[in-house]
Amino acid sequence: MIPITALKDKTVALFGLGGSGIATAKAIVAGGARIIAWDDNPDSVARAQSAGIATGDLRQADWSQFAVFVLSPGVPLTHPQPHWSVDLARAAGVEIIGDVELFVRERNHIAPDCPFIAITGTNGKSTTTALIAHIIKATGRDMQLGGNIGTAILTLELPCADRFYVVECSSYQIDLAPSLNPTAGILLNLTPDHLDRHGSMENYAAIKERLVAASGTAIIGIDDAYCQAIADRLHGAGIRVVRISKEKHLDRGYFADGAKLLWAQDGEIDEIASLEGIGSLRGAHNAQNALAAIVACLSAGLSLEEIHAGLKSFPGLAHRMEQVGRRGKVLFVNDSKATNAEATAPALSSFPQNIYWIVGGVPKAGGINSLTAFFPRVAKAYLIGEAAAQFAATLGGAVPFEISDTLAAAVAHAAGDAGNDAAPEPVVLLSPACASFDQFQNFEKRGDAFRDAVLALPGVMPMRGES
């Protein structure tokens, strides 16, 4: 735990008592502050009370006593409309912050020079965060991993000079962290997302920009117009910007050419790494993730040799192009995290052909219409869930398909068909391009069910992160 000593002897209001909210409340109290915490869910309030956290309805509180108001990132700050607690804080002139801001202030207070790498972007941030953490940890350095990736940031160990922090930040967390100042900040990409919470794409992009704007080194993917503009703007403001691209050959910066990762400067181009044979980093989207990780680790003082070793041993993340197993030459890949067509596109682009594609669930707007360019790579599609009829109409005569209905049936049929394929490496790919809620609690449960079904097949050899 990181006790928040910067608030010692002050009184703090807190709203949102989920897992990170309770962890935040405990850290505030451990630092010597008083707290009054609340949540709209009575069960959450009861859990906090049983954990020894002082609670009270903030609608009845005297807001003049509060030094700050700590808001959980899942609670609306601005859109679609501010939560009632936000309105009360603003009316009283009380500053509104989140748990990442508390970490930043405590780090600034007790160990301002400790390495702090923060990662954001619409897609790829969890993989990039996990990859950086893996590379650093593999060298034997003291590494702490947290934030939006699933570990509440204030549950980490106390900041000190030689302890590395690798923190994934959502737009909600950045919006509540005005002092965010990582030694290296990464902005991977920007596409429309969470606009219900930010009001417009421009607002969303402006929030994401804050993470890199105050970074010692701003590492920015420039393959979309928003990030390109941010990189140009920050460079013009005198900030150290390192550009990365998975699509463009750069005159200055880091870019991918297939599996080769290259560095260009002053007319010279050097190969700095290769992802050839690293199954957990297959695909152009992972080339971008790897480029960001390499630059961040170099900026933190790691050697290329250390980075290469970490890349090769990276196991990948569950449900994100996770290599589950092999049966003979057939590879089974779990990409259950792909809950829309935009997220499925990198998976389909990662294999040149002979894809046995399991797709479906609760469809998003546009369905799989945007994926038609990848249809020639698909040997057969196996349609599951509510989207089956809609996707069958989209596939038409372009791709052979069957309506499998259930994931278990799809796995069995796809495994059989792929096993009869004469290609060198047919792949059974779960990349649903849909939400999971028609058949599963969440994408994790769907991915677990896929993994279980694959590993139950006769002759399957389990694997994780191998080529």
From Swiss-Prot:
Q: What Pfam family does this protein match (any one)? A: Mur_ligase_C
Role noted for this protein? Cell wall formation. Catalyzes the addition of glutamate to the nucleotide precursor UDP-N-acetylmuramoyl-L-alanine (UMA).
Name the gene for this chain: murD
* Family of this protein: Belongs to the MurCDEF family.
Q: What molecular function terms (GO) are annotated for this protein? A: ATP binding; tetrahydrofolylpolyglutamate synthase activity; UDP-N-acetylmuramoylalanine-D-glutamate ligase activity
Record-given protein name: UDP-N-acetylmuramoylalanine--D-glutamate ligase
Which positions does UniProt annotate for ATP binding? G121, T122, N123, G124, K125, S126, T127
Catalyses: UDP-N-acetyl-alpha-D-muramoyl-L-alanine + D-glutamate + ATP = UDP-N-acetyl-alpha-D-muramoyl-L-alanyl-D-glutamate + ADP + phosphate + H(+)
EC numbers for this chain: 6.3.2.9
Q: Main localisation, per the record?
A: cytoplasm
Q: Which GO terms describe its biological process?
A: cell division; cell wall organization; peptidoglycan biosynthetic process; regulation of cell shape
Pathway(s) where this gene product acts: Cell wall biogenesis; peptidoglycan biosynthesis
Alphabetical keyword list: ATP-binding, Cell cycle, Cell division, Cell shape, Cell wall biogenesis/degradation, Cytoplasm, Ligase, Nucleotide-binding, Peptidoglycan synthesis
Q: Does the keyword RNA-binding apply?
A: no
Query: What is one cellular component GO term in this UniProt entry?
Result: cytoplasm
Cellular location of this protein? Cytoplasm
Annotated SUPFAM superfamilies: MurD-like peptide ligases, catalytic domain, MurD-like peptide ligases, peptide-binding domain, NAD(P)-binding Rossmann-fold domains
